[in-house]
Amino acid sequence: MNNKPENILVCVAWPYVNGEPHLGHIAGNNLPADIFARFHRMIGNNVLMVSGSDQHGTPVTIRAKEENTTPKKIAEKYHKVWSDTFKELDFSFDLYTKTGTDNHKETVQNLFNSLNENGFLEEKYSEQPYSEKSEMFLSDRYIEGDCPHCPSRTKGDRCDDCGKDFEPIDLKNLISTIDNSEVTFKSTKHIYLKLPEFQEKLDKWIKSKTYWRSAVKNQSLGFLSNGLIDRAITRDIDWGVKVPIDGYEDKRIYVWFEAVIGYLSASIEWAQSKDNISQKKDIWKEWWLNPDSKHFYFQGKDNIPFHTIILPAILIGSGNYNLPYDVVA
């Protein structure tokens, strides 16, 4: 038993709810996280274990098209499947929630506004992929082309093979994966997160993590070595969290930005729920604002930069929130 219990936040990757869970989902992130959380409870630490369903990702809209229904119906249908599965397997989540809650939307918009007030957001016009055939702007998963930096075929604005970021317009031989048509580009305005302003702080912070797994640390430093670029955090879509500024009513916040905020929004939701036996509505701050607390993120390897680069930048830019203690991937 520890003389002084530690506050341990266990953050488990949020799955896209576009289908049923399989053994890989359970064994990959969730089982190790559950074992870890149970161990820390056994030795007397104050553990908060949270996760939830990522309801706003493109895979959800793709599945909705396949089933000839709405993204909301798909998101709710498979959220229940995932939630019920975790209950049946007796996982010890303090809260398994979803990104469709009002609390999550409010938390995301609050951090968006804080970043904006602190000067870390910027409006830009850019050329974005568009399908004339389907008469719609195309999100990352809907375009495929040749990487401008290596021979690979890739989707979106980042190559998984070489790890480099780029603008979609830099891809060669582009096609729409929706209708297999040639992709054109149209000018549209978006809000960008000024990631280069966090480069120095992130580099120093990551290098200080002497206990991180080498794969996690090396991939993160490699990401930084390529040089951070401004990243759009809004998209021309109608499914997701609304952008809290005028002139963006027809756009939504990009899922990679809002999903990683889910760990914070879930902590706040839990604190306000009947499951919080202390009934202190602000008890979430003991995990998020107390510098002695430790955050552990259980992720797949493809999610490393979102939790070592993107999330820390958001947390640094919007307030004095605790950064990840360890990213387990």
Which residues does each predicted region cover?
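Structured secondary-structure scaffolds
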Residues: 2-51, 103-106, 172-329
